[in-house]
């Protein structure tokens, strides 16, 4: 089930550049359902499922990485100085429980400031070490920590967790592969790396695959909490078909095909116009001489925080859209 798959992938450690554990979990989940599965030099997990003869090759991309902090220095007192990996804000990190890949736990703290505005340079991580020597037995320079995993049900349909960006899309793509029979078109499913630091993995994968068209699957921002009204996207009202963001204007034929798939599936959808951000869809679109591409988004509150919130009804609808889309007629 989609919810079970989501819970499985949410709990795996995988900051940008260290996505191997996520890829291993997905490989174990998918290997019996696909025609080929491999990992490329970048670390992207590339899964292929053949369609009917003369079908187009559609690249779907959902990124495995999530934001974190990397250790840059260790003070004599044992506190860790850190710098962001991806879009980490100071407000989201204040007194947050974090965990390293080794299992070491810590608390991210902002030190008091005197006469200056607090910034990321004032952030440190307390791992309980009495001094630098003890800290070095626990972590080292270059180690990365992420928000500690916790899955919190909110009401009947909603779930909060860190790494929802973009593990919810990884769960969607995995379920598409497991549930679809022989699709009309060939599926090249990429579980990409390093999206949070510049869609690096998807760019390399798209160049190698050279798809006929592509779809990024990601979260998008929300407009349904106090004093937050844009983008005009609400949780529970359907997955969002992206028209544009800072990185791309969706190719009209792909955008319209996603809308048609939603209407054929009989599920609600929203139109997304995001005045910031970017997704793997742009990396596909910019590849080689250009690839027709779009993005299907899951509305998500409090993106890049320890409590990213989605609505499972949007997830269920998105899965139906993807099923219809992959069986679409995209010409000879």
Feature map (PLM): residue ranges:
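N-terminal hydrophobic/helix-forming segments and targeting peptides
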Residues: 1-332
